[in-house]
């Protein structure tokens, strides 16, 4: 019966597409398997990427994707949490997971000889996590401790405040981890329903990189995922677009007994499929992405006003955020904001130079290549590419896109984005509207 069943499934299976060492197969039900053969390594990394994150949650279950990620490791129908831990420890591997705004990833990194165990463990956790009542209560306490720890970290807390200021009541603006209130109120039924409704095969990608064979990998996935994934899964509900955001960018203030004042300000950007995506990355890098960037040089190296200052770029499917962060002594806050506003105004008006554009492009290229030093990095690139674009975008394609960026494109983009109204968050001992520097008040109004 098993052999006959596999034969029937094989007829519906889409033939593997092969490109430069990368192979792709779509199984019945829509589950995609993407592999990259890296013959020079003795390791293998397996990741199950689920196209579900915190932006897919309703307000009453904020933090459900992250809570569920924790919970699925507690027990399955055949393994306890200790069984799972001992199985991966016995081969010297790594088994972990993380949740983001738009996806959740469960992954294992092992020797190539232990690949089947890795697939078995990850599949068991993702598909058969029990969501038992006792486990829910135990892990709830762990997540609440994690929220408290995040709230104690000024940069983490500020990041959540900033996205809320920029995206308002849209799910993108809520913390991935949830809040004390939402996690405390979440029920086992809600978490189980989230698992069943959101973890559907068409939203899943199994990405594998290392010393692996594609056909063998597909066979392993069919064996360990198989009918357990295909049967009994409803179609996933649609994702809420960021086009429906109530209100414009705002200002959020948080008072905290600390030595420094922290500020994060920025603007909304288009999403990852935007034709100027890499010009945006060049702009971010030139602004505050490196040691030679405008902000770092002007605020830290030239004036010594702050130790930590940088820009950041968050890109989602249909929107994003270009932001600037700085932390300084409260007495220097006005001076720091003066320099930030001058740098942003200068780049918005006059743009960056050819030399700055060249350095930023080189920084991006080098960072991408250096970031692919192990099988885990290649696996992550495979999974993200398939989940975000529905196809493999090789490193050569990305590097070519960066090379094609011109300084004229970057400067047109700077003029378009940096003249917009800013959203901002301020956290510190004297954070109030009365004490805000004039430059910041102008930028957020």
UniProtKB/Swiss-Prot annotation:
Keywords assigned: Hydrolase, Metal-binding, Metalloprotease, Protease, Zinc
GO molecular function: metal ion binding; metalloendopeptidase activity
A GO BP annotation: proteolysis
Cofactor requirements of the protein: Zn(2+)
Disulphide-bonded residues: none
Record bears the keyword Zinc: yes
Catalytic machinery residues: 69
Annotated stretches, region: Disordered: 232-251
Binding site for Zn(2+): 66, 70, 146
Keyword Nucleotide-binding in annotation: no
PROSITE patterns with a match to the protein in the record: INSULINASE
EC code(s) of this entry: 3.4.24.-
Name the UniProt record assigns to this protein: Uncharacterized zinc protease ML0855
Taxonomic source organism: Mycobacterium leprae (strain TN)
Lineage: Bacteria, Bacillati, Actinomycetota, Actinomycetes, Mycobacteriales
């Amino acid at each position: 019966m098993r052999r006959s069943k596999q034969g029937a499934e094989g007829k519906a299976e889409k033939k593997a597409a092969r490109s430069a060492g990368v192979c792709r197969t779509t199984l019945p039900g829509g589950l995609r398997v993407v592999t990259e053969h890296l013959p020079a390594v003795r390791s293998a990394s397996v990741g199950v990427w689920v196209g579900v994150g915190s932006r897919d949650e309703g307000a009453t279950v904020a933090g459900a994707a992250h809570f569920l990620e924790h919970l699925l490791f507690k027990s399955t129908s055949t393994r306890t949490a200790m069984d799972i831990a001992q199985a991966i420890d016995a081969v010297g591997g790594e088994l972990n997971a993380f949740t983001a705004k738009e996806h959740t990833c469960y992954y294992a990194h092992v020797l190539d000889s232990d690949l089947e165990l890795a697939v078995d463990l990850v599949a068991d956790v993702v598909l058969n996590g029990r969501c038992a009542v006792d486990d829910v209560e135990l892990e709830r306490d762990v997540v609440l401790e994690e929220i408290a720890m995040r709230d104690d970290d000024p940069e983490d807390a500020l990041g959540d405040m900033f996205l809320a200021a920029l995206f308002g009541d849209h799910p993108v603006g809520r913390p991935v981890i949830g809040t004390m209130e939402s996690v405390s109120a979440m029920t086992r039924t809600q978490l189980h329903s989230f698992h069943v409704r959101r973890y559907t095969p068409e939203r899943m990608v199994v990405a594998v990189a290392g010393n692996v064979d594609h056909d063998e990998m597909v066979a392993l996935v069919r064996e360990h995922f198989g009918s357990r994934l295909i049967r009994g899964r409803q179609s996933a509900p649609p994702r809420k677009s960021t086009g429906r955001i109530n209100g414009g960018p705002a200002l959020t203030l948080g008072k905290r007994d600390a030595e420094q004042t922290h500020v994060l300000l920025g603007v909304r950007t288009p999403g990852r499929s935007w034709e100027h995506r890499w010009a945006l990355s060049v702009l971010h890098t030139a602004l505050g992405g490196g040691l030679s960037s405008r902000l770092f040089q002007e605020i830290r190296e030239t004036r010594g006003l702050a130790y930590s200052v940088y820009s950041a770029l968050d890109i989602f499917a249909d929107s994003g955020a270009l932001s600037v962060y700085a932390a300084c002594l409260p007495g220097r806050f006005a001076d720091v904001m003066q320099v930030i506003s001058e740098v942003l105004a200068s780049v918005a008006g006059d743009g960056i130079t050819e030399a700055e554009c060249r350095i930023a492009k080189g920084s991006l290229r080098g960072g991408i290549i250096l970031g692919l030093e192990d099988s885990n990095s290649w696996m992550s690139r495979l999974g993200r590419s398939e989940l975000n674009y529905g196809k493999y975008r090789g490193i050569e394609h990305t590097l070519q896109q960066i090379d094609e960026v011109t300084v004229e494109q970057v400067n047109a983009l700077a003029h378009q984005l940096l003249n917009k109204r800013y959203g901002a968050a301020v956290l510190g001992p004297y954070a109030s509207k009365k004490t805000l520097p004039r430059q910041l008040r102008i930028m957020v109004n």
